[in-house]
């Protein structure tokens, strides 16, 4: 269970303190008017709970900050020039594609007494079939410009789970090689998903 209001307040604080780019205010207003803060992160795989999407985004942010802080202790760190704005954008907004993506449906399940009852569950209601990471890039770009590094990080954050990779596309290897920050955001996403979140 997550505290939706506490997570929303923390998300807004991080966003407003770090993201100052032109158009970011309009994007934040759109987010606040959307289901972002109450949506699940998935229908069944991780954080499939009320407020799971915002919680996941914060977890990815925290993991990325921790990874970059550790990497930057090294003299030859690849991340010394990554701004706090880029970290916030690439992690807090990486799953923007999930806004208005899930809906609650009902199914019949036997309870502990053997009686059938209707229980809610999340289903996918795809309104903009534009992919996953690339859809998030597209949606963000409707409000503000992304740097190439941010776009790559958001676009490829799914890593090997990305449908393009599953289909045989090898672009991800080139992207991770050319844009180390994209690799780091993917690792932060995996850590958040498998180490920090509800998977029931």
Describe the role of every protein-language-model region:
Residues 1-112, 116:
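Acidic/His-rich, divalent-metal-binding segments that scaffold phosphate/diphosphate chemistry
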Residues 47-49, 55, 67, 79-198:
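Divalent metal-dependent catalytic cores for phosphoryl transfer on phosphate-bearing substrates
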Residues 1, 199-200:
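C-terminal end-of-chain micro-motif
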